[in-house]
Amino acid sequence: MPGRTWELCLLLLLGLGLGSQEALPPPCESEIYCHGELLNQVQMAKLYQDDKQFVDMPLSIAPEQVLQTFTELSRDHNHSIPREQLQAFVHEHFQAKGQELQPWTPADWKDSPQFLQKISDAKLRAWAGQLHQLWKKLGKKMKPEVLSHPERFSLIYSEHPFIVPGGRFVEFYYWDSYWVMEGLLLSEMAETVKGMLQNFLDLVKTYGHVPNGGRVYYLQRSQPPLLTLMMDCYLTHTNDTAFLQENIETLALELDFWTKNRTVSVSLEGKNYLLNRYYVPYGGPRPESYSKDVELADTLPEGDREALWAELKAGAESGWDFSSRWLIGGPNPNSLSGIRTSKLVPVDLNAFLCQAEELMSNFYSRLGNDSQATKYRILRSQRLAALNTVLWDEQTGAWFDYDLEKKKKNREFYPSNLTPLWAGCFSDPGVADKALKYLEDNRILTYQYGIPTSLQKTGQQWDFPNAWAPLQDLVIRGLAKAPLRRAQEVAFQLAQNWIRTNFDVYSQKSAMYEKYDVSNGGQPGGGGEYEVQEGFGWTNGVVLMLLDRYGDRLTSGAKLAFLEPHCLAATLLPSLLLSLLPW
C-alpha cells in the first residue's frame, strides 16, 4: 500500500534526524479532496465560510474529467482563476454537501426504553424522552452511489447506517461514537450499535486502523482508540459472544496499529518504558481546515511548515483539536504555530490502551485462548508500570502528560489527568482520595456548570472556559467507581451540575451542544476553528448515562452551591447520620 510505504520511509528519515526538512506524503491520494492545485485554489479563495464544506461536496462527474477541466481553466488564467469563475466551476462540477447521505430511522428505535422509568424528576424524564427521539434525527445511511462510484465522494463507504454527531459533522467520528453507543444501548438499540461496530471493524480490516472520521482526508490519522471498549459495552448489554469470536483478531489488529506506529520509549530510573503518543507523519494542510493551516504556516520559516501541519494532524488525532496541552513547553505556547502534540505522552491515550489490553485479556479468556489472554495481561502490566513511573505524581495525586523533549511532566490541570481512574488502570488503592484532593487543590469543584477542560484561557476550544461531555464522564465515572463514599458523592454532585447545565440550555434553546461555557452560566461554548455545533451525539449519550445512573436523585431545580470541602461535608452529613441509625 503506497501510504504505508511512505510512512515506513518517513520513520527511517526521522530516525536519521531528517524530519522537518523532508516532504511528507499527503493525507490521501485524491488530488481533489486531499492535495493539489484544485484544492489549494478553491480553499484559498474562501468560497465558503467553512473549509470543510468544499471537501465534503460530491463530484458530479468522474474525478479525471474534473481535474482535466480544472487544469485547462487554470492554465488559461495563469494558475490563478478569478473567484467568480472558480465559483462557477465548483457549482458545475460538484454537488451540494450531504447529497450522498440520506436520513435513517433506526429499525430498533422504540418509544419508551426502560431506563426512562428510573428517572424520578418528571421534567428530566420528559427531557430524556426528547433526547431519545434525537437518535432518529441523527441517523444516517449512505446512498448506493457511494459504493458504486467511491471516487466521486470524500465519504468513506460504510455498509451499515450510523449515528452522526450533528451540525457540520455529518459523517461518523471515531471516539465520539463510544459515548453515542453508550447512549444507544440505554435506548435499547443494540442492533444499531452492532452495525456501527461492524463499520469500524471493516475499516480496520481495510486500513489497519479506525480513521479519525468517515472522510478520505481523515484516513491517515486516527482518534483515541476506544474500539475495544465499544465492543465491551456491546457485550455487556447483549452477551453476543459469537460477534466477539468473529472479530477478536480485528480488535487485536487495531491495537497493533498503535503499537507499531505510535509507540515511544521513555528512559527513567535506569529503565526503558514503552508508552504511546499521537503522531501523524503526513504533510500538507488539513483539507477540512486548509486556509487556516496555510495562513498559520505562513508565520513560520518554509522549512518548518510540513512539521507544523503534521503536528496539527496529531492534535486532531488526539480528539483535543486544539488545546494548551499541545502548546505548553514549546517556543510559542500562546500560538497554534507552536503546536507539538507528538512531543508529549498523553495520560488519556495510555489509560485507554491500558483498559483495552485488560479487556483483550478478558475477551481471550472468555474465548478459551489462554496464551493470548496471557499476552495482553502482560502488556497491561507493563503499561501500568510505565504509567506509575512516568506519568503518576504521588505528591500531587494525579497523572500528567510527559514531555519527551523537556523530560518532565506537564503539571497543568486537565480532566484527562484522571483518566486512569476511569479506566481502572492504577495500583494505589488510595488513588480516589488523592484525586479528590487534586480536584479541590485546583478549585475544580467550585465550577457550578461543569468541569472546565483546562484552566488556561487560550481561545482554543479544548481549554477554559469550555466543558465537554466526555471529560465530565471521565471524572464522574472515575470517582463513582471508587469505594470511597466521599468520592461517590462528589461524582453525584458533578453529575447534578452537568445535568442542570444541559437541561437549562435545552430549555432555553431546544438544542444540545458539543460544548458548554462554565464561565457564562453554562451557555453553549465557543472558541476554536468553527462555530459551536448542535446535535449532539456524545453530549446526548453522556446525559443519558448520568440520568440512568442517578435518575432517582437528579433534579431539574436550581443550581447547587459550590462543591468546596465545607459544602461537601454539609451535603454528606445527612446521609452519613442516616447510615448510623438502626433500621
UniProtKB/Swiss-Prot annotation:
Chain residues carrying a lipid of type GPI-anchor amidated serine: 556
Q: Which residues are glycosylated?
A: 78, 239, 261, 369
Which residues lie in coiled coils? none
Q: Which PROSITE patterns match?
A: TREHALASE_1, TREHALASE_2
Enzyme Commission (EC) number: 3.2.1.28
User: What are the residue ranges of the propeptide?
Assistant: 557-583
Top-level lineage group: Eukaryota
Q: Which reaction does it catalyse?
A: alpha,alpha-trehalose + H2O = alpha-D-glucose + beta-D-glucose
Q: Where does substrate bind?
A: 168, 175-176, 212, 221-223, 286-288, 319, 529
Q: What membrane topology is annotated for this entry?
A: Lipid-anchor; GPI-anchor
For this UniProt entry, which residues form the secretion signal?
1-23
Q: What are the UniProt keywords, alphabetically?
A: Cell membrane, Disulfide bond, Glycoprotein, Glycosidase, GPI-anchor, Hydrolase, Lipoprotein, Membrane, Signal
Expression sites (tissue/organ): Expressed in kidney, liver and small intestine. Also more weakly expressed in pancreas.
Any GO BP: trehalose metabolic process
Q: What GO terms fall under cellular component here?
A: extracellular exosome; membrane; plasma membrane; side of membrane
Kindly identify the disorder that the protein's record connects it with.
Trehalase deficiency: An autosomal recessive condition characterized by the inability to digest trehalose, a disaccharide found in mushrooms, products containing baker's yeast, and dried food. Individuals with trehalase deficiency suffer from abdominal pain, increased rectal flatulence, and diarrhea due to osmotic water flow into the colon.
Binding partners and assembly: Homodimer; disulfide-linked.
Q: What does this protein do?
A: Intestinal trehalase is probably involved in the hydrolysis of ingested trehalose.
State the family named in the UniProt similarity comment for this chain. Belongs to the glycosyl hydrolase 37 family.
Supply the name of the protein.
Trehalase
